[in-house]
Amino acid sequence: MKRILVIGCPGAGKTYFSKKLKEITGLPVVHMDNLYWNEDKTSISFDELNKKLLPYLKEEEWIVDGNYHDTLKLRLEYATDVFFLKMPREQCIEGILERIDQPRDDIPWIETKKDAVELIEWTIDYEARTKADEEALLKEYPDIKVHIIKSRKGADTYLEKLKKRFHR
């Protein structure tokens, strides 16, 4: 495990999981939201995002946290492992609501109730819009180890096993 992608629906716990992976493995984390979004909530183009992302991907070791389907193929070209957090929709919505008005280091602003409503709408449509494409794309890279995590408990269990493996 040297170059890790953590993907999944908003609110699935990607950032939490990525930070825990960093604690265990010592790998640096790149948050896609910090690359894509500006402090004023405007975003850059996906071409610009790919250009900003590429130097990180060329590094020997990393954890990249975030979805951004339009950049997934590029990220998969470099990844050794993918953690796909397939949490139940209700848990994802809960995760979104829990971070309202909370300072975070993975996004350049504090999310408001309005932001949460937009993310919840996106989350409700996630499976129909994105999930199948992501699963199909992952199959194009048989050498990448894909770890499917379907619950918060499953995530915690995996992280505990990894701690033992890394003697932490």
Feature locations, PLM:
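Walker A/P-loop
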Residues: 15
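A glycine- and Lys/Arg-enriched "phosphate-lid" helix/loop adjacent to the NTP-binding pocket
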Residues: 87-130
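The conserved Walker
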Residues: 10
